[in-house]
């Protein structure tokens, strides 16, 4: 049993030593912060009708014109209306 504990600790330590940090310049970091999932401002809907109207409009049905507004309204429909 002691051998397996020692082996586990050794493997954990070697895996931690092999982790490499990748540098990120400030422009990339601020772009990542602005586009992060937690920072999105989602529109507020009082009912499902407005969200469904936004989600099912023609611009949201086309892959090339699908944007964050479409994603927010469609996510609202999936989470609250279906």
UniProtKB/Swiss-Prot annotation:
Expressed by the venom duct. It comes from the Eukaryota. Disulfide bonds join 48-70, 55-74, 60-81. Residues 1-21 form the signal peptide. Keywords: Disulfide bond, Neurotoxin, Secreted, Signal, Toxin. Residues 22-39 form a propeptide. One of its GO terms (molecular function) is toxin activity. The keyword Lipoprotein does not apply. The keyword Secreted applies. GO terms for cellular component: extracellular region. It is found in: Secreted. The cysteine framework is IX (C-C-C-C-C-C). This is Turripeptide IX-07. It comes from Gemmula speciosa.
């Amino acid at each position: 049993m002691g051998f397996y504990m020692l082996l586990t600790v050794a493997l954990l330590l070697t895996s931690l030593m092999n982790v490499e940090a990748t540098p990120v310049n400030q422009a990339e970091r601020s772009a990542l912060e602005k586009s992060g999932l937690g920072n999105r401002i989602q529109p507020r809907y009082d009912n499902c009708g407005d969200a469904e109207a936004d989600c099912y409009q023609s611009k949201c049905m086309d892959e090339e014109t699908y944007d964050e507004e479409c994603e927010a309204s469609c996510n609202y429909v999936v989470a609250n209306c279906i």
